Amino acid sequence: GSEMCIRDRFAAQKACFASGITRPVPHRLDQLCRLRRAILAHEQDIEAALQSDLGKCRTEAYMCEIGMVLSELGYLLRRTRRYCRDTHVLTPLAQFPARSFIRHDPMGVVLIMSPWNYPFLLTIEPLLGALAGGNCCILKPSKDAPATSAIIRQICAECFPLEEVAVVEG
């Protein structure tokens, strides 16, 4: 059933992450670029879904959800390379002459469960950070925003293999 499907997706994503495909920064930036293109291509569909689910007008849909996602996308496209670099920190005297740094490594598979009230923003914005961080993601949009959930599923299916980003509805 549904539980087995989720377990299979989780196992496939763990294997995808272990393969290392999501680690290179150029791959992460490509994912973000693909997502931006898809959001722009489906902007009217997203607005219609938000109208259907929550009664949001086009202006509110753009200002409170789509525009904020696009703004965050632009920010991450400009900054992801910098965020992925090692950060040098002070080395304790006892460890001299070693050099110390913090390495920013991806963690694996991220589950993002979002609420109904800002269903596009609060599903896609955490996805952006997870992808920029080099992780695989399972998205669980709110069942109380079915039209928005469906367009999120469609956009993600166009942009990513299920092993990288999967949407679980219901």
Question: Which residues does each predicted region cover?
Answer:
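N-terminal Rossmann-like NAD(P)+-binding subdomain of aldehyde/semialdehyde dehydrogenases
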Residues: S2, I6-F101
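Rossmann-like NAD(P) dinucleotide-binding subdomain of oxidoreductase/dehydrogenase enzymes
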Residues: L93-G170
